[in-house]
From Swiss-Prot:
Residues 24-106 form the Lipoyl-binding domain. InterPro entries: 2-oxoA_DH_lipoyl-BS (IPR003016), Biotin_lipoyl (IPR000089), GCV_H (IPR002930), GCV_H/Fam206 (IPR033753), GCV_H_sub (IPR017453), Single_hybrid_motif (IPR011053). The keyword Membrane does not apply. Pfam families: GCV_H (PF01597). It comes from Photorhabdus laumondii subsp. laumondii (strain DSM 15139 / CIP 105565 / TT01) (Photorhabdus luminescens subsp. laumondii). Its cofactor is (R)-lipoate. Belongs to the GcvH family. SUPFAM superfamilies: Single hybrid motif (SSF51230). The glycine cleavage system is composed of four proteins: P, T, L and H. This is Glycine cleavage system H protein. Binds 1 lipoyl cofactor covalently. The glycine cleavage system catalyzes the degradation of glycine. The H protein shuttles the methylamine group of glycine from the P protein to the T protein. Keywords: Lipoyl. GO terms for biological process: glycine decarboxylation via glycine cleavage system.
């Protein structure tokens, strides 16, 4: 069973969102998602300064099994990307909720937060998929 940290919010497409304060949010993929994808070999991240909209495909994670689009969980501006993934994409596998984060976004529409799942809701989604 996958680890689903209670302090995070989730999207049905298996991204997680962590509030950092000041309308800034860190985004990554869940432990469940990286387990399905397998060993990461490449991560294509958005550019700092990019404007993205809720639901946009804004990044790609590529594993030995498949390439998978990452969808924006919130609208806003990309303010940071995890450059460590250029040399070590496997961090997405080993540390999906910490060192394996993908990007940070400055949210432009806080009302979108209400569409995110809490840990209990995301766990229920995982239970349905099994």
């Amino acid at each position: 069973m996958s680890n689903v940290p209670a302090e995070l919010k989730y999207v049905e497409s298996h991204e997680w969102v962590r509030a950092e304060g000041n309308d800034e949010y860190t985004v990554g993929i869940t432990e469940h998602a990286q387990e399905l994808l397998g060993d990461m070999v490449f991560v294509d991240l958005p550019e700092v300064g990019d404007q993205i909209n809720l639901g946009d495909d804004c990044a790609v994670v590529e594993s030995v099994k498949a390439a998978s689009d990452i969808y924006a969980p919130l609208s806003g501006k990309i303010i940071a990307v995890n450059d460590a993934l250029n040399d070590a994409p496997e961090l997405v596998n080993s540390e999906p909720y910490h060192e394996g984060w993908l990007f940070r976004i400055k949210a432009s529409d806080k009302s979108e937060l209400s569409s995110l799942l809490n840990a209990e809701g995301y766990q229920a989604l995982l239970d349905e998929e099994e």
